[in-house]
Design a protein with these regions (language model features):
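Non-catalytic, well-ordered alpha-helical segments in soluble enzyme domains
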Residues: 147-170
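Mature extracytoplasmic/periplasmic domains
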Residues: 97, 164-180
Length: 180
């Protein structure tokens, strides 16, 4: 599988980020992080039960997860694979958020998943950057008005977070944006 790791130099990088989160060895600052819905999908093979057990590390947790997936799949094996598929970044982000919450750390977590027009690639890794920096017009994809609305709001969230440590605030028209 895909493995991404930092180069630990003990000058700037003192350990793998998730290990540092687990040990509560991160700076005491509010974080904002998230992922796109279609990046680095982990898709089970034909042995969905074995895949889930390996992923979760325990038969009990795998069964709990697959029970939910099977209910949503309604007996369709292809749909079960789809329901059981997960985003690798999503699971890591949610685990980090859970650990941070147990340590009393403040954070904001988002999931980015609008339909991205063009080649049906979904909300792929880094597709959120065009929106965060309001650079949709520099892309070849045929974005429409609602994409520009999403972009404006995302840029506002990030700007508010940079200014105040809290992404929540008002839109350009003075209307409060949905709270994160």
């Amino acid at each position: 599988g895909l493995h991404i790791a930092a180069v630990i130099d003990n000058r700037y990088i003192f350990g793998q980020s998730y290990d540092r989160v687990l040990a509560d060895e991160i700076n005491d600052v509010t974080l904002m992080f998230g992922n796109t819905t279609d990046e680095f999908k982990l898709v089970p093979g034909d042995d969905v039960d074995g895949w889930a057990k390996e992923l979760f590390g325990s038969e009990k947790e795998a069964k709990e997860y697959l029970d939910i997936c099977r209910e949503a799949a309604k007996g369709d094996p292809k749909e079960l694979k789809k329901q059981a598929s997960i985003c690798g970044f999503d699971i890591n982000a949610k685990m980090s958020a859970t650990v941070m919450a147990t340590h009393g750390r403040k954070y904001y977590y988002y999931v980015f998943g609008p339909t991205i027009p063009g080649d049906n690639a979904g909300a792929f890794h880094s597709s959120d950057l065009w929106f965060e920096f309001e650079t949709l017009m520099k892309c070849w994809r045929p974005f429409d008005g609602h994409h520009y609305d999403i972009s404006r709001k995302m840029c506002n969230y990030w700007a508010n977070f940079a200014k105040t440590g809290d992404p929540n605030g008002y839109d350009a028209d003075g209307v409060p944006m949905p709270r994160m």
